[in-house]
Amino acid sequence: NYRKYFKVVRHCLEKEGTFLLHTIGVEESTTSTDPWVEKYIFPNGMMPSSRQITGAIEGLFKIDDWHNFGPHYDKTIMCWHKNFTKHYQSLKHNYDERFFRMWTYWLLLSAASFRSRSNHLWQILLSQPGSNNLTSAFR
């Protein structure tokens, strides 16, 4: 489905248009996801590898920039966890203990996956091969 997705993106872009892909990625290519994540967090979700992305865009786009924010994303998720646990008491009347445990588990698991660098948060700037638009990527 990655190739089909990028073909649609290209079709929607103007000739000089650029596309920023913001995605969580993994080191190893896979065609399945964790059953728990599939059921409770991201139904039909999939994290692509760099190889799957580059294979899907070949001939459709050129890569202008590829940045990995993964090492910093651990801190973001830990802030979400802190806020979630801090404010859960005010949410308790709408969400049960199971909900609290599931989201605590998910946030801590996610933070660990970025801390260990098994997951990455990528922003990939793409342009069409014939484009003369030299977009600057700011860091």
Give the residues covered by each predicted segment.
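A short glycine-rich, Lys/Arg-flanked "PGG" loop and its adjoining helix->strand segment in the class I
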Residues: R3-T18
